[in-house]
Amino acid sequence: MIKSVVLIMFGWSIVYAVPKTVPQNTNIVKDTFTLYALDAQMRHKYYQAFTFFDELYKQTSEKEYIYQSLQMLEQSNDIKMLSKHTTDALNKFPDDEVLQRYKILVLLKEGQYAEASQKAFIQSEKSQKFADYLLYAETRLKLGDYAGTVEALKKAYTLNYDETTADRIALIKYAQLNQKSEAIKFLKEHIGIHGNSHILGKRLGSFYADSGELDRAVLIYEETYDAFKEQSTAEEALKIYIYQKNFTKMTTLLEKSQLNDPLLLDLYVQVKDFDKASSLAQKLYEREDNPLYLAQSFVFKYEGASNRNDPAFISEVVDGLKRANLELEEPLYLNYLGYLMIDHDLNVTEGMGYVKRALEKQPDSAYYIDSLAWGHYKLNECVEALRLIKQVESMIGIDEDEVRDHLRAIEKCKTKEK
């Protein structure tokens, strides 16, 4: 919970045992043992770090090292040792505020919440300092006194209006005291006066969403994302747009946040924005080296083209799809490539080979059978073409324009052949 009642440690690491011979020069002692202590701390060897800081205090008599040694005992979760050394330190410095906080912390860890609360109250009333109000709030929270927790947090909040305390006040009001409107009002006022933050904007958005005010929720999520560029906030906005099926807003959000490019690609395809879809698929291919995206890039390039009969353009698309299908072996793209070659008379036999590979994987696909029928038609093999297109008709009917056009053309081919 609250662990800011002690001094914040810096740290980096190398691990050594305490030397048996202590250097006599005070500066050498401090520098050497400080390095040892920081090394142990960064390696999460907290008891070892404690021994170094404890030795530093013995060699220098600087009270700072008492605080740091106690912090290491707290980090090691050795409550018994923490209690003993806190008591020893208080015997030497009974009026020390930091040591009094450690005493309260020990009581909390021992589960003596009422005594901890009593001492924390006296300490906070006496010092009227931020850390003591936070510690008192923690004791009230342990006792389940949510109203008392909020009151203590408010006293801390008025000293510096920090966002973490504001967030805790709002969360307890909303979740524990059921003061939902007050919690929302409090956060709005804080943001209006002291400015927004990633934490508070996301919290306010979650309150709105939980209350069913999705438009307000997504607005604050978007504003917070625009200000701080935190992806998790964009994710919350995206969830709402997905729920609302607001594809336009979803697309705009995904474009600026780059949160989910595969989803953005799907959205481009849904609205038939094939130019953007092709560019994005190419970007995804370059980033992930996935041949699926290479295939999609050329499919969308073809679908979005204004002149599909340009020989150079068709050749570019076919070559791209061939490259993709070297690794991909997906029936959808094998058939697409094969049909493209058949329809544009670019080596019809080779195109039929791609279609047959697709049919090996999905032999009951009416669309792949239709492609094969069209290949036989292009080769003037009208009997086989008619047999296949009639099979397609029996499977899916002729409601689709392309199937109906193929059937009519092949029936004429059959008639002509007679």
State where each predicted segment sits.
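N-terminal leader/linker segments that initiate helical-solenoid repeat arrays
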Residues: 14-87, 91-98, 118, 411-418
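Alpha-helical repeat scaffolds
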Residues: 20, 49-54, 79-91, 113-125, ...
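Short helix-capping/linker turns of helical repeat alpha-solenoids
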Residues: 28, 60-62, 95, 128, ...
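Amphipathic alpha-helical repeat scaffolds of TPR domains
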Residues: 28-32, 63, 259-262, 289-305, ...
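Alpha-solenoid helical repeat scaffolds
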Residues: 34-35, 64-69, 98-105, 131-138, ...
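Register position in tetratricopeptide repeats
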Residues: 42, 72-76, 109-110, 142-143, ...
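Solenoidal tandem-repeat scaffolds enriched in leucines and small polar residues
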Residues: 127-235
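Alpha-helical adaptor scaffolds
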Residues: 299-311, 321-360, 371-375
